Amino acid sequence: MYNPYQQQQQGMGYNPQQQTGYGYNNYQMPQQPQFNQQPMYPQATGFVPQQPNLYGSNFQTSGGSGMAPQQTGFSQQQTMQPQQTGYIQTQPTGFGGTAPIVTENSELKIPSIRLSFISAEDQKKFEHLFRTAVPKGEQSISGDSASGILLRSGLSAVTLAEIWNLSDIDKTGSLLFPEFALSLHLCSMAKRGEPLPGILPEKWLNEVRSFVDQINFTVPDDPSKILANTPFANFAPKKESDWLAPQSTGYLQNQSAPPMTSFQPQVTGFGGQGLVSQATGGVPMPSTTFGNAAGLTAQRTGGGTLIPLQPQQTAGLIPAQKTGPLNPQTTGFNQQSLQQQRTGGLPQQLTGYQGPPQGQGQQLQQQRTGGFPQVQSQPTGGFVPQTSFQQPQLVSQRTGPMQAQPTGSLQAQPTGRPGEWGFVSMPTGGIPGLNAMQQHFLPNNQLPTSNLHSAMDNKLKENVTWAITKQEKQIYDGLFQAWDNQKKGYVDSNVALNVFTKSGLSRSDLESIWTLVDTDDTGKLNKNQFAVAMHLIYRRLNGYDIPLRLPPELIPPADRTLKDTMDSLKNSLKGGVNNKPTKPPKPQSKPDGTRFKNDDNNFGYVSNVRHRRKSTSDESHKSSVKSSSDYDLSIEDMKKLIHEKRILLDALDTEDQANNYSRSSSSMHEKQIIENLKKEIMAVQTKLDERGNDGPSSDERNKLLATLDHLTRDVVPRLISDIHKVNQEISRKKAEVFKLELLKKNPSWNPEDDESQIQGTGPNGEVTDYDRIKYQSRQKLKQRMAALTGKSTGGNSDLDLELKQATEKAQDEASRQSEMIQDIAAGIKTMEDECAAKLSSSVTEDVGHEKWEQGKGISSEVAKFVKELEAFSKEQRRNIAKSQKQEQTREPLAKQQTNASLVSDSGAAKSAYATPEERAAYIKQQAEKRMNERLAKLGITRKSKSTEQKPPVESKSVSNHSPVPDSEVKSVTRNANEVEVQKPKPDSQPVSKNREPAEQPNSKADTNSVGSQNVVSNTNDDTSGDDDDEEYKAILKQKQEMEARERERKLRKQKAKEERLAKIKKEMEEMKKREMEESQDEEEEEAKQVTSVHVSRAQSSNANSNVIPQQETATENVNTVSQPTSTDTAKQSYHPHESNPFSKMNNNTSQNSTVTNTGTNPFFKSTSQETKIDPHKAEAQRASQRGVASSGGWSDSEEEESEEESPNRAGAAKLASLLFGGMPQPPTTSSSSLNNDAEKVSEQEHENAKQVASTPLSNDDNGKTDSGPSGFAGENESSFSQAPPIPVDAPPAPNSIPPPPPPPPQFSNEAPPVPDSIPPPPPPPSVPSTVPALPDSMPPPPPPPPPPAAPNNTSSSQQASGAPNIGALLGQITGGASLRKVETKVSSGATVGRVL
């Protein structure tokens, strides 16, 4: 609060030698009583700087003019003293050269509202700056003042323009305080390098708007606005700056007594007339800055101690005012500046108080000075002090009863013609992405396109107009000049292509833009065309469509003018000169009397009343045409009128019909065009549906994108975090486990780094680094104490080191795991980005989808057609899907029928499959049918069936790769066991050798046919996808050829079979006769048995040589039976082997290795047709037959004789059972089929012949681990092994064994599993000795699972003597004395022959 009695001293360049007013000890001011009666001259009372101090000499008239010091303060009435008149000299007060003082506009009323986005300190600074920049009487800062302040930030003009657009919310061109604070805050953001927002945040905008509204509510209404246009407008208060208004100069003639003042009456040349007392102090004057001078110092008035006045500068550069000798000064505590005065040079005037002059609307207030706190202020004219270094300017005045104009809340209006360049209003909210676009399209800039799209945000901007704004035009012109290096005034197509492709738009969009811009088809663009192209690119980047033709706003002015000129020329050329509008010809010269021509019809003004009757009568006579409105019409006239009207009506009807026809025809034509368009659209939609649209719809993509976001942003990070936690926990647990192991081994060990003993002081009891350091210091102290006292600390450095290494190892492993997890997370992130890029859609696609897929934003008719098209498309897709499904179903069925027909042609009427070939064909047909059904259910169509359409006989080459069902395996093996007993004599070996070359060509021919068939089938496979009919014909042709070969082969086999059967029957009859003859005598029996051995060997040899083709039949049995029950894996492995010719070659050349490696696996048997005889094994076979053996077989050394060196003994047992089939057999647990077949061999010769045909199967099964021998003598072995198909088609197991075999699995690979009750057979040479003792061996039961044994010394000696003891030999057989211990390392009878 201001204290008027407190001295206010300012050391701003005052001159201490100057005193004004009273001296230090005087009560009166010095007066100069000269020039008492001189007239007053003009006195310069402005603030002239640096005037000399005039107190050092007398007042001179020529030393300038100035105001005499006046007494201030309250005192007694004093006599009037003469006042110096004339040129009052100015008084310098030492203000020259001082710095300007910044003053605040304290009249501003700014509400105390806090802006949240600005700190309190910054808001206070901004308010101070705003108050100093806003002049008095204003509430906002102008654009010029604001630009001067904002330019001090050092930012570019473009950035400041964006800041201004953001800050000037109401677009008034000036800023209120909240807007000004916002602009300064944005400047500080830009200075810090932060990006400016394109649109103000909602919170900031709401706060600024509410602040502005609060300021607008607090501004009082102007009284002059209220009094305007009313009768009381003259009573409106004058403005303080109205210096042209008449001034009251205090002249009062009839004043009875002067008022009580502290001033002495002054003589001013009018003796006896006193000046009105002036109060010149008591108010703190506002600081002003005229030039380099400082503000005036406040003066103290009133009674009390007399204080000298402060030095005041009263000179300046402001012109004086004509206001009389002394202008009334403002008194009281009102903050107003001293007014410049001009005194002198006027007619003699009375000073003092008088009434105001007429016509002045203000009265001078009477003042009481000295000691009174309430002083009335007086408005006087003058200049408002300026706060700058410019010349003072006049303040705008209201001159007359004009209504005050509002100067706030103006909206920026576009000026000029619509679309005219350079006159387009700037859009609000800034131009989005324009700065980024300017930087992106510069020549040397290689920024990625994604930055530009992210700046544009690819969203529709409402403030992106068609017209080009000034700022945009400047940016586009700058880009044009940057690319036009040679200053040609245009850019060619190559440069424009480089510029436009930087936008990242599609080729079709850029082509459309080029077509719109290059109107002259010159292949180059000038500056205006380049600007239009860039603006179209800019709009396209903001999500707008490219127009089909340029709008008027984008046509350059030069092009528009040229186009208008060309149009006018075309019109003139079309219509000729007569088409131009004719103007009245101008007179060549002024009309004169010589050229005057009188017009008699041109009367002057004639009154209508005077000639009314005459004119009406003339008109009635002239108008002879009757109308329907006449009242005196005759019948003829009425008929005539009716006829005329009828003609007119007919003409109107005809015209209406013509118009209707034309309209209907045009409408029909338009409808036809619309229908054609609809049909074309339907056809295109049909093509699209047929081609198929694999991409998901917009809604599906949005759903997938939402699911992707959920998985990648919620689920995956949580899983990664959990995995990290588990990984760290595993690392800790590993360290703990290792520590526990060490503690278990060393109970006295006390680990040093055991954190379990550390008491954590961190949050939630966690162990911090400080806790570890503290614990380590304690441990060190403990160790030192232990070293001093000699006690053990329980520590062990080695164990500690091991624990530390284990912990570090666990941590390293955990870190590696973490890196792997990070790599996985990075891979997931990459996949997420790829998926998001594929699933995300642009704004244009969404708008197009809503418009043309959902029917939004288009007319009702088009929307209706869109819905119809959608329904039509759905129906099309449904039909196409149904037809495709039917084709997929029909194709496998057709192939199944084809295959079935191929198979049924060869054996359709042979369902009973009396022969093995027929059975194989039937089984194969059934297998193919079931296979096709399964594949059809899985939706798989088999393109080529050539490998499966081969005749059943051709499958022998791949029989090793086919699984065999148990039932078929058992039946085939049973037959093999039944026939194997009838071993032929050794003398039949030449027969088999002779027959072997005859059979090999057949087998080779079959192999060749298979190879050729594979070639043909592969060729058909290649072309099957193109033409099914050709494939079908080729398959039929192959089928016919194979059937012909099959018939020929069957005829040959049947003929050979009949011959072999006849021979076998003869041999059987001879053998039967021998048995009957030798059964009477024991010696004769022995001789008979020896003979029968030879006979059976010969028979077996003959059977093997004759039954070679029948072995193929058994192979077909195995293959065809195995297919229906094989697994999918077996099927997949089956086809490559069957169609691969190299598998046959490998099988032909590697029989030995295959047999030895595969063991008991029947699926890997070779197809060799010539097998070399191993002489060592043959010799071992002969030795075994003769009874020469190294030991009884029960020694521990397994290396003395191997399983492969000893012959197969299973055939000997079967031979013995066949030879003695007529005798009573001991009860066994084997199936009855074996015994019955053995007992009825002699009676059922035809069945035995069939069983003989399958003999190689059993032989191969029994001897599949041997590369050379197969259970016969050496001669038989050679003849047998050289038979081509013997080792190929052997079934794996005999049929006589039930599926669950006996428990002991101790049979070797050489012998097939036999029933538990039948003892293992001895070697073949010991067979004769077993015949008479067979009944003796019935009572003793056999040992539980006796392994096969080698022949012992006893049997060999008996064989050598010639008359062996048969009973003793049979006892040895039943007792298992001659059996040797074997290692059961392959499989037992339960697994042989099963499907793996």
Swiss-Prot record:
It holds the Pfam family DUF1720. One of its GO terms (cellular component) is endosome membrane. Gene3D superfamilies: EF-hand. Residues 877-893, 1032-1049, 1056-1077, 1171-1180, 1237-1249 have a biased composition (Basic and acidic residues). It comes from the Eukaryota. Residues 1196-1205 have a biased composition (Acidic residues). Residues 1037-1093 form a coiled coil. InterPro entries: DUF1720, EF-hand-dom_pair, EF_hand_dom, EH_dom, WH2_dom. It is found in: Cell membrane; Endosome membrane; Cytoplasm, Cytoskeleton, Actin patch. Residues 1284-1327, 1337-1350 have a biased composition (Pro residues). Residues 122-211, 472-561 form the EH domain. Residues 155-190, 505-540 form the EF-hand domain. GO terms for molecular function: actin binding; calcium ion binding. Keywords: Actin-binding, Cell membrane, Coiled coil, Cytoplasm, Cytoskeleton, Endocytosis, Endosome, Membrane, Repeat. GO terms for biological process: endocytosis; endosomal transport; unidimensional cell growth. Component of the PAN1 actin cytoskeleton-regulatory complex required for the internalization of endosomes during actin-coupled endocytosis. The complex links the site of endocytosis to the cell membrane-associated actin cytoskeleton. Mediates uptake of external molecules and vacuolar degradation of plasma membrane proteins. Plays a role in the proper organization of the cell membrane-associated actin cytoskeleton and promotes its destabilization. This is Actin cytoskeleton-regulatory complex protein PAN1.
